[in-house]
């Protein structure tokens, strides 16, 4: 119920700002994994992660709902544009009155699934099973955004260093 109220409240802000009536999106709670929400523009639908909503309550309602609704509103107002481009940022800040944060910072321990430790020159990265499997199949390499080094699976390095010591 809080979700629908937040959508209605934010829609009213957009309707007033643009002096028009936006079509309200349908909502469901089928997102799994690390994502808090996803906007399906052509379907005019927003899907939310029920576990992250339950665990983060008010913060989720204040951050994620406007974020995903802004995608829908931008599509209805401007058509196809960059997902987090200037139109989306304007919609978030000027119309909905919230900060234009691209990523949530919720604790995802309960929704993360199995993770695999990879290392680079500066830190350890936890990758999902999907990314891990892509690396194992030699389809992908991932590079650290900070040190620009290729990520290596921690267990492979442990086995390699044990074998070289003999």
Curated annotation (Swiss-Prot):
Residues annotated as binding Zn(2+): 67, 71
Active site, renumbered: 68
The superkingdom listed in its UniProt entry is: Bacteria
Gene3D superfamilies registered for this protein in UniProt: Metalloproteases ('zincins'), catalytic domain
Q: Which GO terms describe its biological process?
A: response to stress
Does the record carry Disulfide bond as a key word?
Answer: no
This chain's protein is named: Protein SprT
> Entry's InterPro entries?
SprT-like_domain (IPR006640), SprT_Zn_ribbon (IPR035240), Uncharacterised_SprT (IPR023483)
